[in-house]
């Protein structure tokens, strides 16, 4: 069995800087997959790019959180349980998961998919911003079941995993816990007919890896070229021409650097 790595550009549509980076990397042939944050200010531009370029796998990055301190967005539906007093979505995935009214959440997720369609794109697949729909943050796994049911209704794949492997760690979760989570995910994925990758490779920004981009690059490429057989998906948010007040320099990595790294990995494993 061959090894496949899907590298998905998350946060498409989050801001103009994200759009510029993703546009450029698609055109260079360094990306084949991305997902749009529909509630965000630059989402329409991203969705229209997707509509004009159906050769790319561009889906919807289902969003229920707004993590930036001074750059925010709110739910399309205005649902009370999905926003703070400011009118914006909550900062943390655990808060979003614990506070969400299931009926309001269903309406919001469907609104995001339908808004993408209204802008002309047909989402190729669905995934989730910050893991706020996985259920593992607070144990509200009914949130995950709802999400997978919606995926099934729309006939869309969802980014989670159907297998566990020591070479593809889930940060902060030992193998036993990963197996327990898999026991929840897999039956619902089968019940609702939702395709998923075999493995989900989560970026793990430890303090050690935050010391420099070069160090992170070296370590992440070691992981990428040693993925197990099957389909593995990983992801990252891309920006260009934009600096943020973050502890990690990774948030300022340029599209030129990403282009070089992708060419290196492509020589070792098959990129999807």
What does each model-found stretch correspond to?
Residues 9-12:
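DG-centered beta-turn motif at the end of beta-strands
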Residues 132, 136:
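Active-site-proximal segments of metal-dependent phosphoesterases and phosphodiesterases across multiple
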